[in-house]
A protein has these predicted regions:
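Active-site-adjacent pocket-lining segments in enzyme domains
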Residues: 2-8, 12, 26-35, 54, ...
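Hydrophobic residues within alpha-helices
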Residues: 19-20, 93
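N-terminal beta-loop-helix "entrance" segment that forms/cooperates
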Residues: 34-55
């Protein structure tokens, strides 16, 4: 799947979706926010309604021309992460995207419930919210409690409190020259 795409399902974690969108756009990255439903409105786990840029059915899920700089992004939150994982067309698109050389980024519960749906995870270093690591570990991935981890073509983040660190790791992949500029603009001295 071409481009930088954040996928939203009802019950997504507000900070994990919106901080990533904000940081990437501050870095000059064109981001698509995609609803997995047949409507643009998606409601967060805290009751905030977001209008997505497009719906999954309108997105080009093809893998032709996909590179590591094409990123599928999955925020956590409950029941949002379960809803993402239950969307089989999205999970199949993620598997095809990753197999074609694309990058997958997930935070909080999403590494455990979404990234774990990929096949080739042996030796992958990852982070996630506590108690969501077992499905990845069962596939040979190695948990670390870091705020954000970039391992191969998978980027993971620990929790809402580390959403900006997670977003900066994605930005570092896409345009490393913008990371310090964005950190400075956001007054991030220690992240």
């Amino acid at each position: 799947m071409k481009g930088i795409n954040i996928f939203l399902a009802d019950g997504f974690e507000d900070v994990e979706a919106l901080a990533v969108n904000d940081v990437l756009r501050r870095g000059g990255i064109d981001v698509n926010v995609i609803s997995i439903y047949d409507e643009n409105q998606v409601t967060s786990s805290h009751g905030i309604t977001i209008l997505a840029d497009m719906m999954l059915e309108d997105a080009d899920l093809g893998a032709k021309g996909t590179t590591e700089r094409d990123v599928m992004i999955f925020p956590g939150g409950m029941p949002g992460t379960k809803n993402l994982a239950a969307c089989e067309p999205l999970m199949e698109a993620m598997r095809v995207h990753y197999a074609a050389g694309g990058t997958v980024a997930a935070i909080c519960a999403a590494p455990g419930l979404v990234v774990s749906r990929l096949d080739s995870l042996d030796g992958l270093e990852f982070t996630c919210f506590d108690s969501f690591e077992t499905l990845l570990q069962a596939k040979g991935a190695v948990f670390t409690p870091k705020p954000a981890v970039h391992s191969g073509r998978i980027i993971t983040g620990r929790s809402a409190g580390h959403a900006v660190s997670f977003a900066l790791e994605i930005l570092r992949l896409l345009d490393p020259s913008k990371v310090e500029e964005v950190r400075h603009a956001m007054y991030l001295k220690t992240i």
